[in-house]
Each structure stands twice: as C-alpha cells, then as structure tokens.
C-alpha cells in the first residue's frame, strides 16, 4: 500500500490510535467518508473504519449524521463521490438538490499556473532540500557537544535500543556450498519470531555453531550471499556474515525491487515510525544480539566490516559493543548532513535515524570510536 511520509504520524500506532479514532472524535457532528472500490488503498480497511465510526454514531443516536460511500473508480475524487458528497451536504443542511450534474467550464491552462513562468523556484521559492539544509545547519550550530556516555545514552534513545540485551536463542539451518566454500547457516531469534541469519564461511562443522576467539564479521549492503560471491579474497581468520531483518535472506522481494520508492523497505520503515520505533535501530539491535550469542560461544574479539547500509549499522554497533577490535567501512556516507545537501540520494530512508542531527553525526561518532579501536574507511 503506497503511502507518503506525511501519512506516517510518528508514534500513532504505538499510542494505540488508529485512523478511525480521528473520525470518531467528530461524533455526533455530520460526517461523510468517501472511498473507491479500485483504490490502491485496500477497500477492506475503508469498510472496517466506516463500521467502527458508525457504531459510535449509533451510541450517540446520531446515525443520520454519518454516511460512507464506495464508488466504482480507482484512487481519486470522481463524479460519483462528488454527487454523494453534495447529496449528503444538502440532506444535513435541509436544502433541495438543484443540480447534481452542472455544466463544467474548463479553464485555460495558463489560468491554472501557480506562477507566471510555470516554475515556482524562479519566483523565489526554495526547493525542499535547500530548506532542509538550512534547518539542519541551524540545528548543527546549536547542537551541544556530548561526551561518550552522553552520546551513547542519546543515540540509544534515538534508535530505541534496549540497554540490556539477552543471549538470543538460535537454531542450525541447512548449510550450502557457494564457490567451493561450505557456508554454515544459523537462524538467530533476536526478538520473538524475528530471525536473522548468521553465516559462517568455510564452516568445518556446519551443523554446529563453534565460534573462535577472534573472528571477522561482515554486515553487507543488501545480501551476504552476494558479497560472499563477489569477494574472493577474504581476510585471514574465520569469516562470518549476518543478514539483519529485511536484508539478505529475510528480504520479502527480489533484490531488484529493493530500492523501489514505494518498496517493502520503505513501508517497513514507515510502520516502525508509526509504532514510535526505529527500523535502523532494530537492525543495530539485531547485530548486538548476535554479538551476545557469539560472545557466549567464546568469541572475545571481532573485526567488523560494513558495506554501505551495513557500514551505517556498523557505526552504531561499534559505539555500543566492547567486543569490536577494529572496523573497516566501505561506501560509508561522509555524514548524514552531506546526504541532506543533495536533491536526491539512492540510500533508502530506513538509514536515516529520525532526529539524529539534533544529537550528533557520523564523523563525531567515529571520533569517539577511534579513541579505542582502529578504523579504516574506503
């Protein structure tokens, strides 16, 4: 179901509210809801809302003040809905319906232009990315400098990450062979019914999760399997990969649709916003949970590698985990602010923590991390 960002009120579902509640607040005042059978917003939701609202109008003995209509068109405000609206208004106002099908005068195109030259930017308006840039600069200018503990506390709140993380349950999955390498697979339950996939390259005992004291852990951009295929020169030592929720093996669609403007990643991110959570924060939490498992299995030192989306996740993981010995980030954005300066970026919206610039930015986090571990960026 395509939705634009303004249709994701932060924390709405988390507070127990739903769309119907906004209409219920109008009871017993007159209200008509207009829908369409072939709308890409599923008509089942429209019917459910209408039935809930009608129930409350009945409680107030004002059933005559409520109506809902489902037309036979796709998304839009068509003639059938217009007629229904006018009829309802006239009923409430106790007015006679004079003409439901008036003659429509088609305006000339030039009379409908928003500006003389058909370009509002030429008339002095600012594009949205310039407004964002200016607002961000003001936020950054007034941002308080935080010490390491303050930084961790504020980012933890921003990403909604629990301070205490238990060792997660895991189960062994069937292994497979890739480019002559045996790949062990392990499903790690980071939350109830949320399974992320841990992979071990060249696993000698793939039916058993045996972890070395020092390992290399890779967080891929989209898919661990793709990066295993591409990388013929693994670092020395034992190499592990992790597919966090919504990436790799848990992607609900094929990779070619991942960056679709209204794709699943965008929708999942929006749902987390509605629940007052952070999709990126949950991915960071996934990795931190896996680190707890690896530590319980005897791992004491981790060399962390992150590519693009995985690098962003890795920045926050490195801040919170003492197991990390070194980090290597590939295709890591210079900063969140640098992405705001551009009119368009391909990076999915799920990688932008809401409100992060009020707290910090990537370079400041790297400065803190760099005081205790080695950082390489390419």
Feature-to-residue mapping (PLM):
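Catalytic or ion-translocation cores adjacent to nucleophile or general acid/base/metal-coordination motifs
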Residues: 1-4, 331, 337-341
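Alpha/beta-hydrolase-fold serine-hydrolase catalytic core, especially in secreted/extracellular enzymes
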Residues: 27, 34-216, 222-238, 245-297, ...
